[in-house]
């Protein structure tokens, strides 16, 4: 717990450090704090270039509740642009007494400076207006008696009584002792006679640093910089707060007389300089006179030999150097130090060099440079850059060039909102200097329209690049036309263009290309984002390649190439040309001519264990187009080598994960994992056979706790099995202790159950009779409901095969699925339920291993269409195979005519509920406020969910499956918080699917073409993915909350889209908008979406802001609308 608190304090310290560095130079000047009949004022001054909200001056009711309530007349200071002022005329002297503050805000952080005013005719006067001490100091707060009265003296803290002195014991100096001061002792202390009031009270303010002397940090264990000239060490940052008249990292550098501020740029313009001005700075400094002045009114000059704020510093100059009451010892050339006690090169105030007043940059990466001179030369940690929002940047690179210190800063992504006044700041022992400069961030240009294809041939295309109009800033320096084949994983090619019409040459025949335009503006990083993509296909020059090509090993020296029958459109003679070449030996190449009426060819006389590349084309008098390359190995002539790199990890009390690697070229068809309890007979082992050789890890489940197992791994091919690997030991963890014996309670329970046994038995028998009657009634009603149906059953089962009776000309082959035995399923809890289906958690046994599973089944009232869709889900899962981002099939079971589908169990439920549970401001407001977060999920976790779904959908699209119901409710969150796509009941295996039946539709997730024409493609899945991404960013909000489905039908074709969530970065929302383009072919593919999300994850930028900010609200949830969809 202490470590956690330390981390939290450390985070707070870092935030405060950034705030102090980036804060405005805020100073409160209290003119004549002792009020008489003269005019008095408060002036609050801020640096003009600093980013801040308007500064304010007000009464400090936290310190004194019972002061005047009248609002202050705050006006703009006529002599300074960034200053506010309150002036009291002589006639309002009676309303002045009290505590006041000046406040400014930077990046939402408030900076408040406090001061007080009191009557000069008060009965007592404080020794000082403020007093700053370290934690643990012994403090005497003293008031000087001015008027003598026969009354008790009373002392208050923050308006509450704490102490009194009998009237005959009131001393000339009234003291309040605070031993071992702590932060809670800080506050405004006041003294008066008991018969007096606020207007006869004297005030002083005690400031207690959070740390002991010369310490700072969250745990007060770091040593402060040695602050000179009565500077104060800030307990949160370790930096020196310099008194008025001094500057620099250690406050050693004296300003010119009558100047003040962090960089000594402010000046007291009155004839007598800063006389009668009390300067108040942020805590823990408090208030003091400017250097050279002392007294409560700061109207007394320092005595000879003294200098500094309140004249508390003694010169003690060496070598007869002169003492100045404003600057201290004035050292002659060659001398330095507070007392001129050191020899050396005279110190020079830093100066910022070669920094232009205005810089124009392009959005993207930006590396500004600050150069500074001075002596000693500024160091790395002494140079900073302040953004317009107050963020302080440290140098990424630093070096010395001649007499200059050069600091290079890095902004990974600068955007137009970053335009404004930036400040280069240098703070050394020789002083501090800041120079503001203006940065104008330009938006990179992007064409609004896709290029137009004017003409195409088999190897060329004529393009109108349509570079105007464009979004963003000009002028345009150059233009690029980017293009590449659609189905090839290769980089974009580009050509520079000067005219609007350009010809692309040397293209591949009968190939689909995509192209777009990129505009470049002046300046570094001026390349804009590519514009909308246009696709086109070049013409053919010959017959297309054979369709359905397949290359499989036949023997150790033979490969079998097959294809679909060829039906050419012309009557010309044709043949199939097959080219075969070896990967290992470039010289081994053969071309074979196959008669056109054949659909296969055996490639003979090959070498065992060798990889070959094969392609084919259909030739007539002209040569046809080559097919894509097919690659296959011949079968091995030797047993495979042992699996390598065996690793066992993620060991629990009942499971462990084993991984391995295998060598290519040995025709490995299966991996066998053999394990047994150490010490048992060889015939008591368990074999797990993994027939997919591409799988390289497996989780053993159903192990006994705290048991040593012996594990061997074999590889198997057409020749036989490899030798086993050297045995590996696996020791499972111990199981958690069983609950303690209930003892007497258990016996009492048995007694109660025994005495009530007959009653329970009677109730049970009655219940069973009623259940049987109800079941008979249900069966009768079901028979009546379908008595007129003469069709065959929707689903037919037969020993591990599934046949769907569809109304089609050609019934497909039955689907083969992994069979589970009914007795190997142990049902546990219901975890989900709908109108016609139910999902239960179960413990199943598969391949001898026990594991958790989710079992899906249909209810008795489900229709034939529901049963057909459910069986279709099994068919889809069988065809899809295994992928980490889809819910994978474990097996299926037919029992009494019903299908039970076993899939992976996702312990964290569906993504929609998971997102809504993360809304911690609704579920645990105290935690949300304490941690300043609106969600238990980070930006990275949310983007990982989005990337997982995109990866799974890319796999589905490659398998040419359409999901049709992609939404957060149909995404499950598995182990290690991996998102997995589920609910394939509506999936189809065609490239384009037209829905012809009515039913409940997920309208809020459907693409325009699906709503209007009931057409579903992978592109319509992309639209749904964009809505799902919106659900993730909005933490489970309802899409189009507050709108009816009828309104959606009307507004979507008019260009209306989901609004950008407040916590969403522009780049993520732009990705959503791309998914919602009206023309399906203009939407990105899932592979492109995944590339964009992976780049965002690598940049580790906060693309989804889950920080709790002021007036934060979650996106709306309308469950009734979701059900209606």
UniProtKB/Swiss-Prot annotation:
Domain Fibronectin type-III, chain residue ranges per copy: 447-541, 545-637, 642-735
GO terms for CC?
Answer: cytoplasm; cytoskeleton; extracellular region; focal adhesion; plasma membrane; receptor complex
Q: Could you say which residues form the signal peptide? A: 1-22
Regulation affecting activity: Angiopoietin binding leads to receptor dimerization and activation by autophosphorylation at Tyr-993 on the kinase activation loop.
Q: Which SMART domains match?
A: EGF, FN3, S_TKc, TyrKc
Task: Give the active-site positions.
Answer: 965 (proton acceptor)
TM region positions: 749-769
What the entry lists under InterPro entries is as follows: EGF-like_dom, FN3_dom, FN3_sf, Ig-like_dom, Ig-like_dom_sf, Ig-like_fold, Kinase-like_dom_sf, LE_dom
User: Domain named Protein kinase: which ranges?
Assistant: 825-1097
Principal cellular location given in the protein's record: membrane
- List all topological domains (Cytoplasmic): 770-1125
Could you tell me the Gene Ontology terms of the biological process aspect for this record?
A: angiogenesis; cell differentiation; cell surface receptor protein tyrosine kinase signaling pathway; endothelial cell proliferation; heart development; heart trabecula formation; negative regulation of angiogenesis; negative regulation of endothelial cell apoptotic process
Family statement: Belongs to the protein kinase superfamily. Tyr protein kinase family. Tie subfamily.
Fill in the domain comment. Answer: The soluble extracellular domain is functionally active in angiopoietin binding and can modulate the activity of the membrane-bound form by competing for angiopoietins.
Q: Tell me the protein's name.
A: Angiopoietin-1 receptor
This chain's source organism reads Bos taurus
